[in-house]
Each structure stands twice: as structure tokens, then as C-alpha cells.
Amino acid sequence: GLPVCGETCFGGTCNTPGCICDPWPVCTRN
């Protein structure tokens, strides 16, 4: 399946592909 977003992203970037840091500071599916 697709990787799950949800890691914190205080630096503004997400390590998980297809995820964006919005709403900050939590990564969500782009």
C-alpha cells in the first residue's frame, strides 16, 4: 500500500514520499 503520512515535520520537510508538511508540524497526504 501507500506509505502512511503523519510524522512530525518541525523543519518543514517530510521524509515520507507523497507527503507534505501541512498543516505544520504534521505530514499529511499531498
Swiss-Prot record:
Keyword Disulfide bond assigned: yes
Keyword flag Disulfide bond: yes
GO BP terms, alphabetized: defense response
Stored InterPro entries: Cyclotide, Cyclotide_moebius_CS, Cyclotide_sf
Domain comment (free text): The presence of a 'disulfide through disulfide knot' structurally defines this protein as a knottin.
SS bond list: 5-19, 9-21, 14-27
Organism of derivation: Viola hederacea (Australian violet)
Protein name per the record: Cycloviolacin-H3
